Every structure is written in C-alpha cells, then in structure tokens.
Amino acid sequence: MAIERTFSMIKPDATRRNLTGAIIAKLEEAGLRVVASKRVWMSRREAEGFYTVHKDRPFFGELVEFMSSGPTVVQVLEGENAIAKNREVMGATNPANADEGTIRKTFALSIGENSVHGSDAPETAAEEIAYWFSGTEIVG
C-alpha cells in the first residue's frame, strides 16, 4: 500500500452548518491525516479557476455561485491510498445514492450542496493541492 496525498474541500453548505469538525473526524477515523488546512472564502475568479474543467457544463455558473457563497475549508489529506479512501468516505456525488455512514449520506443537502469535494486521481490531486497550497504550507 502506498502513502499518498489528496485534496479535500469542505463546501459552504457544510461550513454554514458548523459541520467542519464532524467531517474532519470522519476523515481521521478512516485513517486519513490532515497535513494542511485553511478556511477560505473563494472569490468568483478562484471558483472559476478551480472548477475550470467544468466550464462548458450547464451547471458551471451555479457551481461557481455556490462555491463563492460562503467559506470553505481546503485541506491536504495523507494516508494509505488516500485518494480512494477519501472518495470512499465521501460517498457518491448524489447523496441519495451514497452508502450509509458516508459524509454525503450523513450531511449533504442535495447533489449540488453535497458538503465535500475530493480529488479523483493522482494528477488532479497534485493540481488541486497546488492551486491552494505552497509546499511550505504542507506539514507531514
């Protein structure tokens, strides 16, 4: 098993409801370690840049609006197979399809307000981590 890093974000719907600690607890219980974390309020430009991969999708404007509507917590997680483990703990994008006990099944309000984001591959993890953190901000 490989120790790897992944990017994780707690979205505005969850921070508004003061769920940051509960979500981090679920991640830590799964064996993931937070090695960098900061609370940010994304500007529209930051949200557009971060989600540029979706710029041609019909939901892009709504996504940018939502992500810039309140604070988020961006973080770097580390652990064995961290990318897959984080995605497993988050659950399916649509909370209606998420397994019991996952973050999205427990906390998400809808498919749009689904409480968390996580990288889906090593390449996207590296890009997303670099978008929000300098190397000196990650302390393992």
Swiss-Prot record:
It is found in: Cytoplasm. CDD domains: NDPk_I (cd04413). Pfam families: NDK. It is an enzyme of class 2 (transferase). It comes from the Bacteria. SUPFAM superfamilies: Nucleoside diphosphate kinase, NDK. One of its GO terms (molecular function) is nucleoside diphosphate kinase activity. One of its GO terms (biological process) is GTP biosynthetic process. GO terms for cellular component: cytoplasm. Homotetramer. Major role in the synthesis of nucleoside triphosphates other than ATP. The ATP gamma phosphate is transferred to the NDP beta phosphate via a ping-pong mechanism, using a phosphorylated active-site intermediate. This is Nucleoside diphosphate kinase. It comes from Brucella ovis (strain ATCC 25840 / 63/290 / NCTC 10512).
